[in-house]
Amino acid sequence: MDNDRINIARFIERLDGCFNRNNMKEARECIEYWENEARRLGDDRGLLTVLNEAVGFYRRSQKKSRALRAMEESLSLVEKLGLTQSLSGATIYINAATTLSFFGREEEGLRLYDKAAECYIRSDLTETYEYAALLNNRAGTLNELKRYDEAEENWNEAIEILKKVGYHDGEIAISLVMLAHLTFDRDNTSYEKVEALLDEAWAYLNSDNQAKDGNYAYVLRKCAPSFEYFQRPMEAQALRDVAREVNEAYR
């Protein structure tokens, strides 16, 4: 470790190891340790990286106060470090927007998504995985607000980008599953279209065109309840079983 900086690569490697094992206790301890180290060293950039991971972790753990506290400090650091017009800042905005939307503050979230989108458009980076992730997350917020046409447009654009980029079949599957929900919410008689979207999502979930790591296990667990919701319990259980096997392989 440098005298005044945390080793970000080591932090990410260790945190990824916790997620690959699906060990949330170790993940929390890892985040807390590196956050304390960054604060001790006065390493604002390192702290921003750790806090950004903390935002996502506490959101997934449904720890609202911790997630929002980490989010607010992250946004303050973006201002302090002069990153408001940068792609690094856009990454923070997307995570913050997703968190606000998750906790019912969708309109605030949309403003941050739009701010992040401006960074990618200005940098001519709208055919990237990162921009597709923005579109996916913004679509979810638009869907919550029942702005179905806009949500559908965002998800479809994200899918097309991810297909071009390659190696993100899990994320494509999530988008297709969410489109199935949107289709059903907009018209609950659209059974054939819903089934077609789920069939396509299932194919992407079982594709070999993705790493079988902790993120893959997370994708499977994220999609499983939707297959159950649409009366496909055997597929839902299969997704959970494979997710468990992936995590166990890292232990």
Predicted regions, residues:
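Short coil/turn linkers that connect adjacent helices within long alpha-helical scaffolds
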Residues: 1-2, 40-43, 80-84, 122-126, ...
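Flexible inter-repeat linkers and adjacent short helices
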Residues: 1-52, 57-63, 249-251
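Conserved alpha-helical positions within TPR/SEL1-like repeat arrays
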Residues: 12-22, 46-60, 87-102, 129-144, ...
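TPR-repeat structural position
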Residues: 24, 44, 64, 71, ...
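Amphipathic alpha-helical segments of tetratricopeptide repeats
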Residues: 32-37, 75-80, 114-124, 157-164, ...
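TPR/TPR-like (Sel1-like) alpha-helical repeat modules
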Residues: 156, 196-203, 227-250
